C-alpha cells in the first residue's frame, strides 16, 4: 500500500511525534511518504527522526500564514503521487480542494487530534460547512483519539468516527549522561518537567502559579518547561515566574531522555486529545500529574499510575503536586505507568490504522 502522511511541518509537537511514529512503523511493511508543507528547518525535530525507509518530501513553503497557492501545490503533489491513502492530521483547509477532486480514487483519512470544536478553529472554522459536508458524504474517513474526542466529534458533525488511541515506540535512550542532574539544587530536589508549546491549551500560567505556591511553602522542587513560544501574550505573562526553580528551556530534542531522568511529568491542560507527551512519560515511568481533560482520564487512574487534579485551576493543581510529594508508594506508581504503556505501543496503533486504510 502506498501511504502519504501530510502536515504543515514536522517541528516539535504531539501531532508531529505521532506522525513520525506512525510513518516509521508503517514503513516496515508498506510504501510510506511524509510531506511537510513548510520547508524543514533545524527545528523540525521529527523530520530528522523519520526512518531512512520513509520517503520525505516538502513543498518549500517559508512565509508564515495561509496562502491559497499552497492548496494547488498540495493538490498537484497528491495527484501525481499515485497514493492509495492520504492521511491528514488537522488543517483541513489545506486539503479541501484535494479531497473533493480526488476522493473517488484516493482514500483520505483524517485524525482529529483534539476536541473537535477546538480543532476546527481559525481557517478550519471558515471551512467548517465544507468540512462537515466532506465527512457526512464519506469523502474522508474520520478517526478520533479518545472517548472524549469521539464524543465531541459526534456532537459537532452528527456522524460516527473510528476510535484509535495514540501510540508511540518503546523508549530507546539517546543521552549518555543524566539530562536532569544539573537542575537539582540539592540531592533531594524533585525535578518536574512540562514539555509543551507555550499556548492557552497547555495552561502554563496556572502551572507556574501552582509551583510558585509550593516553592513558597518550602518544597524542594524544580520545574522545567520545554517547548516553543507559540503564544507571545502568554509568554509575557510567564516572565515574573522564571527563577532558579522555574526554568524555561526552549525547544528540546531530548524530551524523552529528560522524562526518563526527571521525577514527574506535568500537564495541567485546559483541553487535550490524547497527549503524546503523556504516553512518552508513562513509557519511561515518569509519574504524570495532570488535569482531568480530554483522553487523560482514559489513561491515568488517580493514585494508581499517576495523579489527577480535580480541575485545571492553580489551587487544584498545587494540591495535586502536594499529593504527589506526600505519596509513599511512588515506586509502585512508576511500575504501574510502564505497565499501562503496553496498551499504547505504536505497533498496535499502526495495525489499527492500516485496517482503517483498507476499509471499503
Model regions: which residues?
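N-terminal strand-loop element at the rim of the active site
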Residues: 5-66, 149-154, 163, 229-231
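Acidic anion/phosphate-binding donor-loop and adjacent secondary structure
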Residues: 63-65, 151-155, 165-183
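Short, structured helix-loop element that forms part of the nucleotide-activated donor/catalytic region
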Residues: 42-50, 222-245, 249
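Aromatic "clamp/platform" in nucleotide-sugar-dependent glycosyltransferases that forms part
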Residues: 251, 270
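Short hydrophobic beta-strand element within catalytic cores of glycosyltransferases
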Residues: 287-290
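Short His-centered aromatic/hydrophobic patch
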Residues: 88-95, 112
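Conserved donor-binding/catalytic core segment of Leloir-type glycosyltransferases
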Residues: 4-6, 186-202, 208-211
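Conserved acidic donor-binding segment of nucleotide-sugar-dependent glycosyltransferases
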Residues: 302-303, 307-314, 323-328
